From Swiss-Prot:
Role description: Catalyzes the GTP-dependent ribosomal translocation step during translation elongation. During this step, the ribosome changes from the pre-translocational (PRE) to the post-translocational (POST) state as the newly formed A-site-bound peptidyl-tRNA and P-site-bound deacylated tRNA move to the P and E sites, respectively. Catalyzes the coordinated movement of the two tRNA molecules, the mRNA and conformational changes in the ribosome.
Keywords: Cytoplasm, Elongation factor, GTP-binding, Nucleotide-binding, Protein biosynthesis
Protein biosynthesis in keyword set: yes
Subcellular location: Cytoplasm
Binding site for GTP: 17-24, 81-85, 135-138
Sample GO molecular function, one term: translation elongation factor activity
Species assigned in the record: Phytoplasma mali (strain AT)
Family matches, as HAMAP family: EF_G_EF_2_B (MF_00054_B)
This protein's name: Elongation factor G
Amino acid sequence: MPRKFPLEKTRNIGIMAHIDAGKTTTTERILFHTGKIHKIGETHDGDSQMDWMKQEQERGITITSAATTAFWKEHRINIIDTPGHVDFTVEVSRSLRVLDGAVAVIDAKAGVEPQTETVWRQATEYKVPRIIFVNKMDKIGASFDYAVKTLYQRLGINASPIQLPIGSENEFKGIVDLLEMTGVEFLGTSDEKFKTIEIPEYMKELAQNKRIELIEKMANYDEELMMDYLNGKEITVEKLKNVIRQATLKADFFPVLCGSAFKNKGVKKILDAIIDYLPSPMDVSSIVGCNFENKEIIRKTSDNEPFTALAFKVMTDPYVGKLTFFRVYAGTIKTGSYVTNATKQVKERLGRLLQMHANSREEIKEVYAGDIVAAVGLKNTTTGDTLTSINDDIILESMNFPEPVIEIAIEPKTKADQDKIGIALSKLSEEDPTFKIYTNRETGQTIIAGMGELHLEIILDRLKTEFKVEANVNQPQVAYRETLTKISTTEGKFIRQSGGRGQYGHVIIRFEPNSDKGNEFINKIVGGVIPKEYIPAVKKGLEESLSNGILAGFPLIDVKATLIDGSYHDVDSSEIAFKIAASMALKQTKNEGNLVILEPIMEVEIITPNDYIGNVIGDLTSRRGKLENQDSRENTVIIKALVPLSEMFGYATILRSNTQGRASFIMQFLKYERAPKNIAEEIIKKRN
């Protein structure tokens, strides 16, 4: 069946912003004006079309990227609505990976906000072309000039208005189009009716100056336009629009629009700008992957190429089960076809193909290059996997997600909850690559880890509402370790005589540090002073004792144990006696005074605006942090530091507070390091 919409008339876009900048409302209005919905939902009323998860409607924020398809002026627009809260940046990241363009929504009063900076960096990393919509022009305190100024100051980008607002706050009533040099006055209707007017007299000079600024910027991108401008020729609307498009497609220039989505002012102009300036799949570079021999393979965006797609999201749907969202980069595929999951090397069947609208769906028979769809039936596919035609051998670059930075211990409230909690947690972690589950071997606790307190709060909420699982949460333990600092030779002798056969085991073992090489056992017994059948028992006794620790019950690591001597008894010696003797020898090292507590050290990378460097560094120092590196980029600084894990609990909240939410951080385990004496004494005291 031929495709309904040619590739050049397809747009895959995301809508991104800081929390509360109005991006879900903007998406709602786009869907309303494109005829996709018949009643406008309001985020603050909890009935927004795109925010379909119960937790989203309660909080009025977007958590998962809802995908939907809309139509405007014979173009198909696939839209992903992304979250604005810092704990859900992974949703933004994976959406940007599969999109061709984006609309960045900023608040006319607040300008560029913290999460705008974070999301902007992610979009820049993926080289996503963007247009900017200055929203809430009707808000008290709205200032278009201020909002545009923050684009330069906080993002350091090359942007220019292509519209100007007529009035602001309660007086906001229209816009000036700097390309057409005409005015538009909104009539205040929900379908955004407007009339074309002349530019108000008091704005004519400003509009003329802003148009000249725009043309001068565009002259840098097109020699013909530059010559026409220098020669005093009239720059046509068509020519200017074409050059703005080329500059925007390079992700080197960002057109700025304005309006009020809530008041239905300027939304249709966003739709026009999406078509005019954002790329179709054909404008985007060919997709590059590797085959199994690591040779580069290039796929063009064409229906005639072999089927190639990237899975970017997994969701559990209450009606159809597991839904896998994927972006088709090349080729076509029909419902019921088999595909290869090239990443995992397994064959999968596409049970059903669905075009999604928030949480409702439309079944389709075939998908084409450039499409974003959801599939039912992909059992083994997870986020970042490549899907190809059978026997094809291309793997696309997967997605990298930050490690979780906050964790809590969790336990089921009842026996019934215990049976369900494992399945529920594994389903949730399948959906979200930044949500991790593991068991703490020392404490036996189940630990859940995520990107922030709100992230884990939502997980616990979903456990309760979707999976009907009640759970208690505790504070997690830090996984400390113990080790030796110098060589010591100790003796372990276990003799027990209580009538009948006794017990006898005797060993002499040399213990020494084995830096970063793990625990090691070496047998140096010669001449049969300990029969070889008892050697495994000595090793086993040491392994068990090492895992239980000596100072505070934490596992001993990086210890080399060499069995050098001992003795045995013909009748009384046994495996158990030698196990106990080995354990006694290890415990003797405590008397040598060479055991220490090790603490996990995290490598922490913080990205903060220049204004907050002092706050951030001061706080890190108070957490026993060691600064490793400081690197300035545009208006931000990247600080690298080594900090003990025990000092990092609650850090996300403190960092937000210290930087007004404008900094972000990632951390990962680096090494174990000797804990300072006072810290070690405190740990031992607590454990004993």
